[in-house]
Amino acid sequence: MQPKIYWIDNLRGIACLMVVMIHTTTWYVTNAHSVSPVTWDIANVLNSASRVSVPLFFMISGYLFFGERSAQPRHFLRIGLCLIFYSAIALLYIALFTSINMELALKNLLQKPVFYHLWFFFAIAVIYLVSPLIQVKNVGGKMLLVLMAVIGIIANPNTVPQKIDGFEWLPINLYINGDTFYYILYGMLGRAIGMMDTQHKALSWVSAALFATGVFIISRGTLYELQWRGNFADTWYLYCGPMVFICAIALLTLVKNTLDTRTIRGLGLISRHSLGIYGFHALIIHALRTRGIELKNWPILDIIWIFCATLAASLLLSMLVQRIDRNRLVS
């Protein structure tokens, strides 16, 4: 049995909370003309800070499976059963409580997830599939820094184009295409950074500063896009974008350095139920929003309410499923 890795547990708990926060604040950031500028800005900052959640999940999986140990048949079974189980729950919810075309959802089951958040199960399967082929080596800090700068920023196709007198100098075209490339890269970086000796106080401070700066740039960039487009655009929110890339690496390093001696009680609970929380949370948020069980006249209270109610309900449902699912196949 593998020894417990405290920082992984804590990081998984943080990432899970961030996913819930993303979907809690989505209505506000995508409906800028229906809310006050202050409300939109608060929701935007919260959403910007939470964009690292998905990259962190890929990094955690990479740390666990891109080393001596790769994904085993039981891991593929689990991801397949999770996709089937939570798709079935989503289909039941769609049939009973929405006007979404269930027949169309079934027809496109292998091309498009039944409910938007279930895309992650398809994407994480790729990490499992390539894990027998990848064993990340120990890499020096300077080499890793250069690699991250080039692939994550300079040659990242999601980098906002920069031009001087019509000459485009960023991003450089290294023919990197597709989000899956970055999902696998996140996994490899999770393993590489996880193996490195990062226990330096100065590095922790630099990581914290980088994360805060990255969140500021993401939020201000999104505000700028809103102002010149007249509507919301996710240019700076992209999971494979350069600023989210930097923030994910910074937060991983910070948590690894500061939360590695024990599992924080609350985060440990969330971590143990992260799969169930992820599977249920989007349905609960949709139900609360569409049934008007919200506090939109008090936006800040509404964000707190939706977040807490969703987390509590998802956690309870996960606990119920775990009582039945003794082998933890879908919970």
UniProtKB/Swiss-Prot annotation:
The protein, known as: O-acetyltransferase WecH
Its EC number(s): 2.3.1.-
Pathway info: Bacterial outer membrane biogenesis; enterobacterial common antigen biosynthesis
Functional summary from the UniProt entry: Responsible for the incorporation of O-acetyl groups into the enterobacterial common antigen (ECA) trisaccharide repeat units. Catalyzes the acetylation of both cyclic ECA (ECA(CYC)) and phosphoglyceride-linked ECA (ECA(PG)).
GO biological process, one term: enterobacterial common antigen biosynthetic process
Gene Ontology CC terms, in alphabetical order: plasma membrane
Annotated HAMAP family: Acetyltr_WecH
Keyword match Chaperone: no
GO terms for MF: O-acetyltransferase activity
Null mutant phenotype: Mutant is defective in the incorporation of O-acetyl groups into both ECA(CYC) and ECA(PG).
